Swiss-Prot record:
Belongs to the MnmG family. TrmFO subfamily. The keyword Isomerase does not apply. It is found in: Cytoplasm. The lineage of its organism: Bacteria, Thermotogati, Deinococcota, Deinococci, Deinococcales. InterPro entries: FAD/NAD-bd_sf (IPR036188), MnmG-rel (IPR002218), MnmG-rel_CS (IPR020595), MnmG_N (IPR040131), TrmFO (IPR004417). It catalyses: uridine(54) in tRNA + (6R)-5,10-methylene-5,6,7,8-tetrahydrofolate + NADH + H(+) = 5-methyluridine(54) in tRNA + (6S)-5,6,7,8-tetrahydrofolate + NAD(+); uridine(54) in tRNA + (6R)-5,10-methylene-5,6,7,8-tetrahydrofolate + NADPH + H(+) = 5-methyluridine(54) in tRNA + (6S)-5,6,7,8-tetrahydrofolate + NADP(+). The gene is trmFO. This is Methylenetetrahydrofolate--tRNA-(uracil-5-)-methyltransferase TrmFO. Keywords: Cytoplasm, FAD, Flavoprotein, Methyltransferase, NAD, NADP, Transferase, tRNA processing. Catalyzes the folate-dependent formation of 5-methyl-uridine at position 54 (M-5-U54) in all tRNAs. Its EC number is 2.1.1.74. Its cofactor is FAD. GO terms for cellular component: cytosol. It is an enzyme of class 2 (transferase).
Amino acid sequence: MSTEDAAITVIGAGLAGSEAALAAARLGVRVRLHEMRPHKMTPAHRTGNFAELVCSTSLGGEGEMQAKGLLQAELRSVGGAIVGAADSSRVPAGNALAVDRDEFSARVTQAVRAHPLIEVVEGEVEAVPEGIGVIATGPLTSDALAADLARRTGSERLSFYDAAAPVIAFESINMDVAWRAGRYDQSADYINCPFTKEEYLRFFEALEQARRHTPHDWEQLEFFEGCMPIEELARRGVDTPRFGPMSPKGLDDPRTGRWPYAVAQLRQEDRAGRMWSLVGFQTGLKWGDQKVVVNLIPGLENAEIVRYGVMHRNTYLNAPEVLDATLQLRADPQKFVAGVLAGTEGYLESAATGWLAGTNAARLARGLTPLTPPPESMLGGLVRYLASANPKGFQPMNVNWALVPELPVPEGRRKLGKREKRPVLFQRGLNAFVAWAREEAGLPVTPPARPTAALATE
């Protein structure tokens, strides 16, 4: 197909859809962009503008100490529209990239509407159109389109709210306290953190006192018995958690040879074993309080939480079951999925997957092969995780350093600490992404200036 004839459809003009449309148009591909607002509003949006931020106004921490800082740098290097609009509408926020909400959305809307290759079609899309396209309809996907997606992918692969537990970096788990084992000597697929009675009561008291996130009126969360937040279980009584997800049955503590008073278990989240989630600890607690509670679990006293637990209305696919790392639907490779619907968490992550989906859709429309960024890059690490994570209980993921390969440790040398390691990971990832974008993807690249290391850490 010639460039003049190449065309794609994008559904949704949020951060992911707007970025996808502009990325494809920059490659000379015509785009038909569908957005149901303002004709049909969602409970969360105030305007009909594109890329409207409905919660926070921050796109995450900047600098080479931050995983989001690397993703920002990768997107800047290829002219990402969302991070460009954010840079132009930023407000003072320390080491974070925060924006003026209205100016940011107005800039994105202007860029989309002014582009000669983008046609904006206002109105609801009730079924995925034929041909090459990007689906980026976000957490409040309309009922009709959600039903069509469920039909295409299998209804059990489409979720309508988050119920996520905290995810811990393996290297921060104290394995002198915790141990690997399954119940009753089954395969050692879990990491177990044992409590004495005194430790459990301290943990329970902190759990009782922890502050809960207040849901938006439009979220209308209904908790199911099999997915009850840990704080809701605690409201039923001091022993409820330890007779539920924290049961010690069948787990002999190698230090004592006996079952502990209670146990917190962690399950492997990724193939490399870098990330482990707390089993049965789905929670809506405020993040600061989550950290306090998690650090009271024996073996997790210095735990690095790479993704906090959340409980909120959402619509997303079980990405490992339905998506490739190119963000193509396995059942229909002409369709790409981006943003929250693809299983990402966060504004920046939505924009980044929108950029890749739009770029790959444009490549496919031009007769080229869709690509995946290198694993050392943050975007490459994220999409590889989406395609290969444990599908059992899959929950949306934000970027973090556990998504990229560890640095090799030369023989006879010590392992680098966090503050030494992250700038090296940052530069390695950015170099790999820039080389990939220029040499493999054939894109114009402007490597951003080396950032000043931010003081804040993740």
